[in-house]
Structures are given as C-alpha cells and as structure tokens.
Amino acid sequence: MSLKERKSINECDLKGKKVLIRVDFNVPLDDGNITNDYRIRSALPAVQKVLTEGGSCVLMSHLGRPKGVSMAEGKELRSTGGIPGFEQKATLKPVAKALSELLSRPVTFAPDCLNAADVVSKMSPGDVVLLENVRFYKEEGSKSTEEREAMAKILASYGDVYISDAFGTAHRDSATMTGIPKILGHGAAGYLMEKEISYFAKVLGNPPRPLVAIVGGAKVSDKIQLLDNMLQRIDYLLIGGAMAYTFLKAQGYSIGISMCEESKLEFARSLLKKAEDRKVQVILPIDHVCHTEFKAVDSPLITEDQNIPEGHMALDIGPKTIEKYVQTIGKCKSAIWNGPMGVFEMVPYSKGTFAIAKAMGRGTHEHGLMSIIGGGESAGAAELCGEAARISHVSTGGGASLELLEGKTLPGVTVLDEKE
C-alpha cells in the first residue's frame, strides 16, 4: 500500500453534511497572541472546500501539552461550572478569533470539546465551530484503546464525515486521529494531508535523481533510524549540526570541546562504511565556525580544516563547507533536509543553516529541484530567512515526517480510506 493512495476530500459528498476536520492549530502563542499563523492558513483550503460545497465544519485540534483531566473528572468539574482541563496558555480561543478573521465569517468557539452537542446541533450549512483543545482530556492521547474510544465516540457523534488534515500528529494513535475514523467507518485526507503524503511518497518512492539528504541537529542518536533508512535511497548525504562532530571524531579528527556522543562512534564508523559499500557519497564539514563558549561573539574563530582547536566548540559549518554543500545541492534533482547546520538562533552561527535553505530555494526556483523540508527547526529556519515560499514542500510535521523518513508507517494515515 503506497503512501499516496488515500481517499481525498475531493471524493467526499459534503453537501448538507456536518464535517469533522482534525486540523493542526498547534500555533505559537505569546501572552495569548498568535506569533505565527502558518498552521491556521494551511488548514483554510479544506475548510473552504466544505463551506463551498454546502457543508458545515466542526474543527478539532490540540495546542501544546496541557496536563489534562480524565473524562470522569471533567464531568464532575462541569457540574460545578468549571471548564475541564482548562489551561490559559493552551486554550484555542485566540485561534477561533484569528480563524474568523481569515475566513471572513463567524467562528463559534465551544469551550468544552466533549460538551458541545448543543452547539453542534444548532449548526446550519456554512457554519464553523472550533472545539476547545482536545488534549484538555487525557483520553485523547491515552495508551488505552478503550479510553481513546470512549472520547472518540462523543466526538464522532458531532459529524457525518471525517477529514484528517493534521499531518503533524499523524504519528500518534489518538482519539481524534484514529479513534473517530474507526467509529465512523471512514476517513479522508484534507488538502494539507494529501500534499504531505504525496511529497513523501515521491521522495521515498522514485524521486528524480540524484537525491541528496541534508541531515543536521544535535544528536546522532535522534537520527539513527533516519540515516539507516535513507542510506538505501540517496546518492549524497551532507551532515551538519552537532551530530557531525561524532562522525568527525570517528574518523580521527580532533573536535575540541564540541558536542560528541561517545556511545555512537561505532555507529558512525559503520554508517560511513555502509555508505561506501552502497556508493553513497557522505560529505562532512571541512571547516567550522567556533568559539570557546556557547554564546554569540562578533568574531568567532573559523578553522582552516576539519580539526577543531583545543578549548573550542564548533557552532556552525564554515565557509568552505557551505560552498561544498551548496555545490552538491546544485548537482541534484531532489533534496530532503532535516535538521539545522548550526546554532542558527544566534546570528554568528546562522550562515550554514540559511545557506542550505537558500540553495534549496534557488535550486527549486531556477532548476526545478524537488525540495522537501522535514518540518521542525529546518522549517523554522527556512521561514526565518524568507526561503520557505520557494521550497517545493515544507512539512508541517516534525515528528511525523521524521518517522516516515525512518521507514515507519503513520497510524493517522493508514486509518484513512484507500483511494478507490
């Protein structure tokens, strides 16, 4: 069963139907103000499709990691006029306001996701209801199938059709991702989910060649399965971020006081050997931007070669490495990027990460490169340097995209109907 063969929202009869859409409105908030509405804007096409077709929308999402209460505790709280599981920092109320402005129509906010039957029963075609944070109830992410089902049953009673547009949580077996479609006996992908599935199917299936994977971030241990799985599919592997120093130490270079996972040196050696056997070209940093402390300075030290001096830590890839990595991306027809090249949040160490984003944006724009950013920090960096709009696909799911690249299946995708 390939990734892309899932029923689409376009194949659903939506007229006069109450449509449950699991969206991902897990947006950053600062004192109740949304600082980046990208995830809300990404969900608009599916919502607008339902409204245009004469249906109404019941939207479900999580936000953050609230403590949550059990359904039994919620019932008790409700009887005394309380709001179950409520946490000010995790309420979706500001999202309802932002969504209303983006849609130019009222959005009704239901302050208790499991006590919204009354609100939902009064809906007419064209209406939009946003339920409060589904994680205010522990059953949403419970390890017990029965508990997840109990919550899903109530939510499923609010609608006729289930659409999943929350790729960011597709790796989670939860009441709203897998419970509802199982109870309703059907489920289809929204436009965002469809786009995610389609791009990952391409890169993991039969992508235009050569294919380069750019992998960064702090720990080798976080990327072991990804590196192992991708090695069977790629032509080039560019390694950056703190994980690169474990690979350099494994090859005998001095890394000063840079971060290193001693327990992963053997894995690094075996991966390099495997890559050689498979004729995958692994490229490691050939120079570094360093300092004696983990802090921003005006003139950090730039090394001459791979070796990092005693008492120094590398915090970004150097100019010669940037040039080499950019040239390699320029030779390729497909590129997938997961993890920053350095501590890009600090200006002196942001050049490497931003250069990768720019090389991918330019390659896509000028040479038709198929470029994919696997969510998380890399997506944030591309957004920060203004390149996100030029990339073929910036994933909205850090954890979900990582699991796909590791070769795992996603419960929130496999539960959806197969394409007829």
Swiss-Prot record:
Source species, domain of life: Eukaryota
Keyword Metal-binding in record: yes
PROSITE patterns per UniProt: PGLYCERATE_KINASE
Annotated GO CC locations: cytosol
Keywords: ATP-binding, Cytoplasm, Glycolysis, Kinase, Magnesium, Metal-binding, Nucleotide-binding, Transferase
EC top class, as a word: transferase
Any Pfam family: PGK
Residues holding Mg(2+): 218, 222, 377
Subcellular localization(s) per the UniProt record: Cytoplasm
Residues engaged in binding (2R)-3-phosphoglycerate: 23-26, 39, 61-62, 64-65, 135, 171-172, 219
GO molecular function: ADP binding; ATP binding; metal ion binding; phosphoglycerate kinase activity
One GO term (biological process): glycolytic process
InterPro entries membership: Pgk_euglenozoa, Phosphoglycerate_kinase, Phosphoglycerate_kinase_CS, Phosphoglycerate_kinase_N, Phosphoglycerate_kinase_sf
List of residues binding CDP: 217, 222, 241, 339, 344
Miscellaneous comment: In T.brucei, three genes code for phosphoglycerate kinase isozymes, which are transported to different cell compartments.
Family, as annotated: Belongs to the phosphoglycerate kinase family.
The protein, known as: Phosphoglycerate kinase, cytosolic
Organism name: Trypanosoma brucei brucei
